[in-house]
Design a protein with these regions (language model features):
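Beta-strand-connecting loop/turn residues
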Residues: 39, 93-95
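Glycine-rich loop motifs involved in handling phospho/adenylate chemistry
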Residues: 65, 95-99
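A short, conserved structural fragment
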Residues: 79-93
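Short acidic, hydrophobic short linear motifs in intrinsically disordered regions
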Residues: 41-50, 56-66
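Haloarchaeal acidic low-complexity proteome signature biased toward cell-envelope/secretome components but also
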Residues: 1-26, 30, 46, 90, ...
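Short amphipathic alpha-helical elements of helix-turn-helix/winged-helix folds
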Residues: 21, 33-37, 49, 53
């Protein structure tokens, strides 16, 4: 386990720490996926989904390099940082990660992530309703 094991379960996170953690898109994707799953997740599963979102494709459409790049950065950098902040429980030896109780403190800082890409919907709606002049 990471040094996050030494933190109290409900330690109050500072805004500076929250902003530092959330400034990276890969970490935001990680937190979103873990929240969706609401269970311990294997690192390989997490890496595949994050890579798919980053590359705007499906898990099946990923290349080996895309998978490996995300897996490596999650393993070496992002999950240890989230664990040290007390936001996830990360067992590096088993390759399993899940949200900790402190993750709830991030709710007000994260934009809601819907399954539907609303920006594309609104763009399509605007294009179809625009009248030519």
């Amino acid at each position: 386990m990471s040094s996050a094991d030494n933190l109290p379960e409900q330690e109050t996170l500072s805004e500076d720490l929250i902003f530092d953690v959330l400034k990276n898109r890969r970490r935001r994707y990680t937190l979103h996926y873990l929240k969706q799953q609401d269970r311990p997740v294997e690192l390989s599963e997490l890496a595949e989904q994050v890579a798919a979102w980053e590359n705007d494709t499906t898990v099946e459409g990923l290349s080996a390099n895309e998978r490996k790049s995300v897996y490596t950065s999650l393993y070496q950098t992002h999950l240890p940082k989230l664990a040290d902040a007390g936001i996830v429980d990360y067992n590096q030896n088993r390759g399993v990660v899940e949200l900790s109780g402190n993750a709830a403190q991030l709710e007000g800082y994260l934009r809601p992530q819907d399954e539907f890409p609303w920006i594309r919907y609104y763009l399509g709606l605007a294009l179809t309703t625009a009248s030519p002049r």
